Amino acid sequence: MSKNYHIAVLPGDGIGPEVMAQALKVMDAVRSRFDMRITTSHYDVGGIAIDNHGHPLPKATVEGCEQADAILFGSVGGPKWENLPPESQPERGALLPLRKHFKLFSNLRPAKLYQGLEAFCPLRADIAANGFDILCVRELTGGIYFGQPKGREGSGQYEKAFDTEVYHRFEIERIARIAFESARKRRRKVTSIDKANVLQSSILWREIVNDVAKTYPDVELAHMYIDNATMQLIKDPSQFDVLLCSNLFGDILSDECAMITGSMGMLPSASLNEQGFGLYEPAGGSAPDIAGKNIANPIAQILSLALLLRYSLDANDAATAIEQAINRALEEGVRTGDLARGAAAVSTDEMGDIIARYVAEGV
């Protein structure tokens, strides 16, 4: 008998409800094809939660997420709420507290150049022709963004500002394990990014990653300095499988990876804790300018569901089926407006219907 799973669904604002509806169509197809018992509960978050409950992250939403196996998150924010105090705005008042509450220490950002979309890649045509499929694994809760001391002091010519890069062994070990486990589900190569020729924190990072690698003899490990990595991503992104990064370096490289795909509408994201509980969301924003027009690209939201299946439910076959269905749709020329470039475009609903049908049929 299959296990029962429960997903907290937080559509949010802007295009969030529209693209979430498409992911739920695909979830229905997964249920049927793979005989998975998945139930869902919907909760307000972000601006809609401010309107309905007076807070971007209501207590009921947090409690609902605590009862779930994973969170499928849409997007939050919009002009309506941008004049609120920063801590009360949808982005800072909802997403960041969720990450903190559930101790989500790792961020996974896949970046893939799909066949047929090479023209959107800003790299040279001969580089884009090779394609790429990269997973950026970023440590989220340590490093220079959170290290102490930090601050400003002094005045005049003696005024200064300072931040501190701090990493503990356990923080490096657990993010390294995420990277190596992820590589086992992919092409079995990890490239660890550091600045070990200069920084003490990077020297420790490299030492510990080497130690963790000994328990993954089936996964290839390489090390690369951050400055070289930024260049190599432009020169030949196809050389990379899994990038393992500290908070700062991952912040930089995950955005670079996103940029070279050419479309934010294709990029999912996962944030995980040590128990495998995760929050899954599109990497793009709420796009209020196109909300309600049925033209948004739902693929990032659907791919976020695929990540949820793979990492929180350990349903790799179902995740792969979604990815194959998306590949098929794109190879057949199915495009939403952001990818059409003047050609015929399908609506948000139509794209969701097509992908769900392809999941149900199998490729």
From Swiss-Prot:
Cofactors demanded by this protein: Mg(2+); Mn(2+)
Residues reported to bind NAD(+): 78-91, 285-297
Cofactor: binding details: Binds 1 Mg(2+) or Mn(2+) ion per subunit.
Any Gene Ontology biological process: L-leucine biosynthetic process
Binding-site list for substrate: R99, R109, R138, D227
Subcellular location: Cytoplasm
Site feature location: Important for catalysis: Y145, K195
EC number(s) on file: 1.1.1.85
pH dependence of activity: Optimum pH is 9.0. Optimum pH is 9.5.
Residues annotated to bind Mg(2+): D227, D251, D255
Regulation: Inhibited by p-hydroxymercuribenzoate and N-ethylmaleimide, but not by iodoacetate or iodoacetamide.
Catalyzed reactions per annotation: (2R,3S)-3-isopropylmalate + NAD(+) = 4-methyl-2-oxopentanoate + CO2 + NADH
A GO cellular component entry from the record: cytosol
The keyword Metal-binding is assigned to this record: yes
Pathway participation: Amino-acid biosynthesis; L-leucine biosynthesis; L-leucine from 3-methyl-2-oxobutanoate: step 3/4
Matching Pfam families: Iso_dh (PF00180)
Record InterPro entries: IsoCit/isopropylmalate_DH_CS, IsoPropMal-DH-like_dom, Isopropylmalate_DH
Gene3D superfamilies, per the entry: Isopropylmalate Dehydrogenase
Keyword Transmembrane helix set for record: no
Keyword field: Amino-acid biosynthesis, Branched-chain amino acid biosynthesis, Cytoplasm, Leucine biosynthesis, Magnesium, Manganese, Metal-binding, NAD, Oxidoreductase
Oligomeric and partner information: Homodimer.
UniProt function note: Catalyzes the oxidation of 3-carboxy-2-hydroxy-4-methylpentanoate (3-isopropylmalate) to 3-carboxy-4-methyl-2-oxopentanoate. The product decarboxylates to 4-methyl-2 oxopentanoate.
PANTHER family (UniProt xref): 3-ISOPROPYLMALATE DEHYDROGENASE
Name by which UniProt lists this protein: 3-isopropylmalate dehydrogenase
Native species: Salmonella typhimurium (strain LT2 / SGSC1412 / ATCC 700720)
Lineage of source species: Bacteria, Pseudomonadati, Pseudomonadota, Gammaproteobacteria, Enterobacterales
